[in-house]
Amino acid sequence: AIINMSSVVGLMGNIGQANYAASKAGLIGFTKSVAREVANRNIRVNAIAPGMIESDMTAVLSDKVKDAMLAQIPMKEFGQAEQVADLTVFLAGQDYLTGQVVAIDGGLSM
């Protein structure tokens, strides 16, 4: 299985992140195209689109910025790296799932 790491920004876009959104959206198109190309060889290709995940990058954000981000997430919490890892393991083990983008974002992109 091939699992690409995209972002909800590739699904939704974001102010001031046109370059990042374009690259992540491109990765989604790439995932779907490659999935079609290699499906007949029993190779599955999917993408994960994380939302706000607690990390060193988010740790430096001010409380004001974090609160503004949390206000946009229906589940009102940031994701954890372990949750993304669990999803990765799940996708790696699925024999009948290909060409999909799975958002793990607390409902942000719905």
Question: Where are the language model's segments positioned?
Answer:
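Hydrophobic structural elements of the Rossmann-like NAD(P)H-binding subdomain
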Residues: I3, V45-I48, T58, G99, ...
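Residue(s) in the substrate-gating loop at a strand-loop-helix junction
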Residues: S7
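Conserved catalytic-site region of short-chain dehydrogenase/reductase
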Residues: G10-M12, M110
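Short, flexible catalytic-loop segment of classical short-chain dehydrogenase/reductase
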Residues: L11, I28, V45, A49-A59
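Active-site helix of classical SDR
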Residues: S23, T31
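Alpha-helical segment proximal to the catalytic Tyr-Lys
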Residues: R36-N40
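Catalytic Tyr-x(3-8)-Lys segment
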Residues: K64-Q83
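C-terminal substrate-recognition "lid" of short-chain dehydrogenase/reductases
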Residues: F78-I104, S109
